[in-house]
């Protein structure tokens, strides 16, 4: 900068004055400039008539100012002149001007201008005028340099100077400021805390209380707060709006579109943004109109800049029927090739004529114009007119009615394609919804009634011009040979055929869906009929069966959780706390054989000591009946075929309880061969000596005492009554095997039938783990009901009769049923263990007795032996009575569970009603009576 000033000083020959001025500027902020000595600039002056001062110093200072500004990457600025006299109340503004001057003319050796680096000393009130007069300086240019800091925040520059109009402008320069995003015009909220009291009083405590409200931030926008950003954007928008208004007012630039409901007097739209037109040779004489404002505008017509002499020619009026009120305001003709302007929108209140551009298709190519369009263009040359106003227009002039060159004539009405027509609601400009093709189906007679160019009294009537209602809308107010046609759209023949094809496909699809629905209904009916027939056949086949109210006995329920397909299978219990292995070769079993008790203790993480007595079941036919040596041998039979075997549990039965259960082995085998529909395994307990220590029943030490605690609390009198009413056990092998195997095949000789008729799915359903979700519905398969009872009521649902209907119950109910089943399993297990212990005890006593008879030297006294034997007999009687009571308790509890399940099935619609059940019971009782009578008759004949 110093080198440049030195060079300039040498060239002009005024080095001392420039150096002095430069030093004054650097030392005293604005030097000795006094704005009172400035020469006023003419208001109407421009670059050519600026008053030149006699002295050449201001020109040099102007060059120096431009040099300073260009050194800081800013354009040279020329500000208009400020007033000559500065009153005392403007001291604060002058002080801020000096501060901003310090910002922009600080150390010239710095690349960037630091912010707020100067101390602002505020002079006292008595020295205000001296300070003001001392800080005035002569002008650098013909415009006042202090006028550059005229505005409050000094962020703008005169736009008139930017345009090159010189320093002369009007006095309304406050509105002609645009933003200058330079690096030197930063004043943010962060500057307030260090702005007001450097070297002086704190802000608000001194004589100057001028508010400092920073509203502009021109850089570092990433660190703005939301308040700063909003103020910045608001001020920027206001400044831009004022600049645009000034430009429009002065007429220097083209007008921009105002907002709707505007009361301004300048037009809407940019003349440069107009719709495209076809080739100019087809449009030698086109009608044009100026751009109009938007809806609800109160403008008074087209602007003056569009009313040029070559556009003021009016076309002749007598070329087309000369109807009254027609062509009263004929638009001026634009030169060939000039693009037409836009049309106003709906509900316009303007009173000037509106005309649409007369191009056949604005969005069509130049090479795609047909013969019909060329003929229409020829007609336009002779009969030019507009397309008409938009709908619901309130213009105050007569609107031309009649001829629309773009509506097809009578011969070409059917040949109008979808690409050719232009409705009245569409216009030629992209800004006013050009390229929009209205839907033909929505353009009914009522749709075109408000949008037609005719009056309400001149509504077009229907004619016999075709089948479509759109073809009938012809204006009949004019002669037939020259009648005006509406701009009616209709689909082309290919598109009509396409629509018909789509309708036909939809009809075929609907028809196919209806046929498919009918077919599904027929299949459901057939399936329901088959289910009904199968249920009837099954009911007939099971007429001899009684209600399945026979409770599951101990061994059957205990073995329900065993899988006997392989010897290495592990028991699957429903409860994890009672999980234990039941075979001797299970990997989860600790193989420590106790020869005294014959039990294996399992390794588990629970506090309950679980024991198991395991027995390897021999296959059928491998058992031995050793009756010669007097040992009690019974049959252990397990049938692994679940489709051809019967599954029954073994619960000790006192011989005096039910004499009908003493059945021979031959009867047992015959019933096994007859039972093909049930999965009942006849398992007998082996009393062989080598299998005494290996039993097949799960045994809980802690639970055994709990189940029998009620018996231990019985009074002595009740015990004596039990003993007196109980006979000793029968140790006969054949009778014991019969007593421990109650058979449930539904024969009339038994009193109660077995409640178990499981298939493989039922067994898997009974082995489900405990569910922790009590809210979701879960499928339930009945445990005690027969398949025939389930499917008879659910046959109407369309399911297969071979599978029972699956019902869904809540998780809470399912868990309750599962716990009831587990409770029955535990009770039957305990009762079976007790029965087996009594049986083993009886067997040991018989063996001891046989040994004593064979031994010549008894080891105890006869009297003591007799008393001991009597005690043992009484103990056996007591034990047998306990077992009998436990069995009765289990039976009653199981009956309750069966009744609850029947009620649950009935509530879910899978069981017949109670009336049906009562009727079935009566029929079965009658059938039993008839068979009993037949048996009596046959016995009488045999005798």
From Swiss-Prot:
Bridged cysteine pairs (disulfide): none
Protein origin, superkingdom: Eukaryota
GO biological process: endoplasmic reticulum polarization
GO cellular component annotations of the record: cellular bud neck; cytoplasm
Region (Disordered): 37-63, 152-177, 315-381, 397-472, 515-546, 616-639, 654-683
Keywords attached to this entry: Acetylation, Phosphoprotein
Residue positions where Phosphoserine is found in the record: 553, 586, 619, 649, 681, 766, 771
Keyword presence, Hydrolase: no
Modified residue annotations for N-acetylmethionine: 1
Compositional bias per record (Low complexity), positions renumbered to this chain: 367-381, 417-433
Keyword flag Acetylation: yes
Compositionally biased intervals (Basic residues): 152-162
Biased composition (Polar residues): 41-58, 318-358, 397-409, 434-470, 622-639
Comp. bias regions, Basic and acidic residues: 515-533, 655-677
Note: Present with 166 molecules/cell in log phase SD medium.
Protein name: Uncharacterized protein YMR124W
Organism: Saccharomyces cerevisiae (strain ATCC 204508 / S288c) (Baker's yeast)
């Amino acid at each position: 900068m110093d080198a440049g000033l030195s060079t300039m000083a040498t060239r002009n020959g005024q080095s001392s004055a420039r150096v002095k001025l430069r030093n004054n500027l650097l030392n005293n902020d604005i030097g000795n400039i006094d704005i009172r000595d400035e020469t006023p600039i003419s208001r109407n002056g421009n670059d050519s008539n600026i008053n030149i001062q006699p002295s050449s110093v201001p020109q040099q200072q102007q060059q120096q100012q431009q040099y300073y500004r260009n050194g800081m990457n800013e354009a040279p600025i020329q500000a208009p002149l400020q007033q000559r006299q500065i009153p005392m109340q403007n001291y604060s503004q002058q002080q801020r001007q000096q501060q901003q001057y310090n910002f922009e003319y600080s150390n010239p050796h710095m690349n960037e201008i630091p912010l707020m680096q100067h101390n602002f000393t505020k002079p006292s009130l008595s020295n205000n005028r001296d300070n003001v007069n001392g800080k005035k300086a002569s002008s650098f240019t013909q415009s006042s340099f202090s006028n550059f800091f005229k505005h409050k925040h000094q962020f703008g520059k005169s736009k008139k100077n930017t345009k090159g109009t010189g320093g002369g402008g009007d006095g309304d320069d406050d509105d002609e400021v645009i933003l200058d995003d330079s690096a030197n015009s930063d004043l943010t909220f962060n500057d307030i805390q260090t702005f007001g009291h450097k070297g002086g009083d704190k802000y608000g405590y001194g004589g100057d209380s001028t508010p400092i409200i920073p509203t502009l931030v021109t850089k570092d926008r990433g660190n703005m707060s939301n308040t700063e950003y909003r103020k910045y954007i608001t001020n920027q928008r206001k400044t831009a709006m004022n600049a645009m208004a000034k430009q429009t007012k002065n007429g220097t630039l083209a007008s921009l579109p105002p907002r709707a409901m505007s009361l301004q007097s300048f037009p809407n739209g940019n003349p440069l943004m107009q719709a495209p037109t076809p080739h100019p040779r087809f449009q030698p004489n086109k009608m044009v109109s100026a751009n109009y404002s938007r809806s609800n505008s109160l403008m008074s017509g087209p602007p003056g800049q569009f009313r040029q002499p070559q556009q003021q020619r009016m076309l002749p009026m007598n070329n087309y029927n000369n109807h009254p009120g027609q062509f009263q305001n004929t638009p001026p003709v634009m030169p060939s090739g000039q693009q037409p302007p836009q049309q106003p929108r709906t509900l316009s209140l303007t009173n000037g004529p509106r005309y649409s551009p007369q191009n056949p298709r604005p969005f069509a190519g130049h090479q795609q114009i047909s013969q019909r369009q060329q003929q229409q263009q020829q007609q336009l040359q002779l009969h030019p007119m507009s397309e008409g106003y938009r709908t619901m227009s309130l213009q105050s002039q007569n609107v031309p009615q009649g001829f629309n060159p773009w509506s097809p004539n009578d011969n070409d009405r059917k040949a109008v394609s979808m690409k050719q027509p232009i409705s009245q609601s569409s216009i030629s400009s992209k800004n006013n919804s050009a390229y929009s093709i209205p839907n033909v189906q929505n353009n009914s007679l009522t749709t075109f009634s408000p949008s037609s160019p005719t009056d309400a009294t001149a509504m077009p009537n229907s004619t016999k011009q075709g089948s479509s209602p759109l073809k009938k809308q012809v204006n009949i107010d004019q002669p037939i040979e020259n009648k005006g046609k509406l701009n009616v759209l209709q689909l082309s023949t290919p598109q009509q055929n396409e629509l018909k094809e789509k309708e036909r496909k939809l009809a075929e699809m609907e028809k196919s869906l209806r046929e498919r629905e009918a077919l599904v209904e027929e299949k459901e009916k057939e399936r329901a009929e088959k289910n009904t027939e199968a249920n009837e056949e099954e009911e007939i086949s099971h007429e001899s069966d009684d209600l399945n109210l026979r409770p599951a006995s101990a061994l059957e329920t205990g073995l329900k959780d065993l899988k006997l397909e392989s010897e290495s299978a592990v028991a699957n219990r429903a409860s994890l706390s009672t999980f234990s292995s039941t075979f001797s070769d299970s990997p989860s079993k600790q193989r420590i054989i106790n020869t005294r008790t014959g039990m294996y203790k399992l390794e588990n993480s629970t506090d309950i000591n679980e024991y198991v007595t395991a027995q390897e079941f021999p296959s059928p036919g491998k058992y031995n009946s050793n009756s010669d040596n007097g040992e009690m041998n019974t049959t252990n039979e397990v049938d692994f075929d679940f489709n051809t075997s019967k599954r029954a549990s073994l619960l000790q039965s006192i011989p005096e309880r039910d004499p009908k259960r003493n059945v021979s082995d031959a009867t047992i085998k015959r019933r096994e061969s007859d039972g093909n529909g049930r999965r009942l395994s006849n398992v007998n307990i082996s009393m062989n000596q080598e299998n005494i220590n290996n039993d097949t029943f799960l045994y809980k030490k802690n639970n055994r005492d709990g189940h029998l605690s009620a018996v231990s609390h019985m009074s002595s009198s009740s015990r004596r009554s039990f003993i007196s009413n109980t006979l000793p056990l029968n140790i006969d092998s054949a009778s014991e095997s019969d007593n421990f195997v109650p058979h449930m095949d539904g024969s009339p000789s038994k009193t109660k039938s077995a409640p178990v008729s499981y298939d493989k799915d039922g067994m898997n359903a009974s082995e489900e783990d405990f569910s922790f979700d009590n809210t979701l519905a879960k499928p339930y398969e009945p445990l005690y009901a027969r398949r025939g009872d389930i499917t008879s009521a659910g046959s109407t649902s369309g399911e297969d009769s071979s599978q029972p209907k699956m019902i869904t119950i809540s998780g809470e109910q399912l868990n309750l049923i599962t716990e009831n089943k587990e409770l029955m399993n535990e009770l039957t297990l305990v009762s079976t263990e007790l029965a087996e212990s009594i049986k083993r005890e009886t067997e040991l006593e018989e063996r001891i007795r046989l040994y004593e008879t064979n031994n010549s030297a008894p080891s105890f006294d006869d009297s003591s032996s007799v008393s001991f034997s009597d005690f043992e007999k009484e103990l056996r009687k007591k034990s047998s009575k306990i077992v009998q009571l436990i069995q009765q308790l289990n039976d009653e509890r199981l009956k309750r569970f069966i009744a609850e399940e029947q009620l649950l099935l009935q509530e879910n619609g899978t069981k017949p009603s109670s009336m049906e059940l009562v009727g079935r019971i009566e029929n079965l009782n009658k059938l039993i009576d008839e068979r009993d009578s037949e048996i009596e008759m046959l016995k009488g004949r045999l005798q």
